[in-house]
Amino acid sequence: ILGDEIAEARVLDLYAGTGAIGFEALSRGAAHVTFVELHAPTAAAIKASALELGVAKRTTVVIAPAEKATTRLSGRFDFVYADPPYASPPPHLTFGNLRARRLVDASTTLVYEHGERGDAFHSPGFTTVRDARYGEVMLQFLRTVEIAG
């Protein structure tokens, strides 16, 4: 999923859960990973893992809903991974915030994970580059595009 574009990248792991995607990015040379996780005990476990792995200085853990966290983040991300609960609708507000606050641009890869029965993400300002399927897991790779008008 991550590929070679992760080296030296700034990564945003939304709905981080265990932080597996973010930690994988760090192991592949990401410069920094911001983990966003709503559940405080899970976020604490991410912090503990970062300390244990010796990568705490290259991580930030935000305890907040993704749609709120994306109104407070700064900088630009090279890679964004969003894995909301499968019963949730696509993250329109969250991705909209990323775009509006210029946290992503046309060079940013956004990956939206959803179940095979879940809806794909479709919204002005974003285009699907490719889709991938891993068993029952669907991955939608997106980029931002200019909106005409």
Where are these regions (language model features)?
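Class I S-adenosyl-L-methionine-dependent methyltransferase catalytic core
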Residues: 1-149
